[in-house]
Amino acid sequence: MRTGAEYREALRDSRRVFVMGEGLIEDVTVHPATRAMVDEYVTWYDRHHDPAWQDVVLTPPDAQGERAPWAFAVPRSAADLRAMGRSYSATIFPTAGNMTHTPGYGNLIALGILDAVRQRKVSPRQVTDAAAYRDLLARTGRFLTFSAGTATIGYRLRPDPAERAALRVVRETDAGLVVRGKVGMHTSPVYAEDVYVGSHSGVDHAGHRATFVVAVSAPGVTVLCRKVSARHSNPFLAPLSSRFDELDGQLWLDDVLVPWERVFLTEPSPEPIASWCFWHQLYCWLAKAEFTLGLALACVDAMGLREHEPTLEYVMDLVTDVQTVRSCQTAAELDPEPAEDGACIPGRAHVAAGSLAMQRARQRMAEILRILPGSSLVVAPSDKDLATPEIGAGLEESFGGGGYTALQRAALLQLAADHVASALDGRESAFELHANGGVMAWRARLRRAFSCYDELANGVLRALSLDMPSIALDSLRAVAMPQRRPVTPPPGRPETS
């Protein structure tokens, strides 16, 4: 595992990055829009060298005494999945679920690519290239992020259906494919070194859907990120949003050469690639939920509400939501499915059920935390206010007491407000409500993954003292994934320049 300093230096490459409202970012390691998140990724790498973290983030010593990062492991057993899950949970929770795309997530993308090309069986070279790329990530700690490859809205509304795909091949060379186009929203491209562009890009090659790993620093690549989440300049008032902003973005490719060893031929659906990614994503959602519960518990104490039963009922609602998803993750790890090479995929039915539970609970959990502390959540002061001679003593009277200084209580309230009442929280809510297709897509995934239709239906019939027809309902699993946000260009509307 490389160090955080080595990762920081790797970002000082030839990448071309724009942030909306900020313009061209010449060095993402020092610019105010990106520096703080770079620092958090530096911390992620450096934890692997910190003795206090090594029992969580590293494997046990092998025969030679060597330890490897769980973040880059290939899970071969339920025990491996459990250990990887513990490492995800431990490293994501301190970010309040806001660091969703890490180099470890990139390893799971690469595992999905490798499994998908093994399923497709196009050629031995495809498998060799995919395996070599995953090994490269594990050996170097290189940071890969994910894009489904969906086109931008302007492309999808083009009058000619043949021009609506995100990418097109400009030419084919001995070295690889030269591609051009614009890929829609994905997370953390400004901090990654590679972006996987998935099958929604619409590029076909040799009778298969072509997907790509594109280096962010490659000639012709431009990353365009959304505006920075609004936040106060004082970190006391923005303890999370001053540190964590992954900056979703688009990827523009202007005649970019993708080497053959980074071209992976798959099926038209990106689902096979994402088998491990969905599991990691649920850990991020769970970390957000656990942080919400932790804040609620801390506020119960700080606001003197531990004997207030209506408040404790709110807390139990949060506990129920958290424990439901924890149980789904445990089940997914203890009931895995085999990949093509025998690696363990977390049980997809359990991950889908947990994802649906989290999608349904997330808005209410945030609402409960907004309710629980009362109006103090809105009017809590800053550290600078408390240090101001004219009002500091009065604020101490207003917010101190019950075993807390005003500074301590205000810090907790500002943390809670930043978690569920900030621009960063608004972005997370808006994004996750439609992530991976939203609730309808997750229902389809669960319908596909649930394996007991026939067993349950026929089991009921066996309780009757009659000869009953055999029921075959396994065909329910053959459901198409809902089409993601199909658009229809308005008829006859003139194009605008």
Language model segments and positions:
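Inter-helical turn/loop segments and adjacent helix faces that build the functional surface
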Residues: Q119-P124, V300-L312, D335-E340
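Alpha-helix capping/hinge segments and adjacent helical runs
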Residues: A349-P494
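N-terminal-proximal low-complexity accessory segments that begin disordered
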Residues: M1-W44
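FAD-binding core of flavoproteins
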Residues: A151-Q281, N458, A463-E495
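Generic structural signal for well-ordered, non-transmembrane alpha-helical segments
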Residues: R35, D39, D135-A138, V178, ...
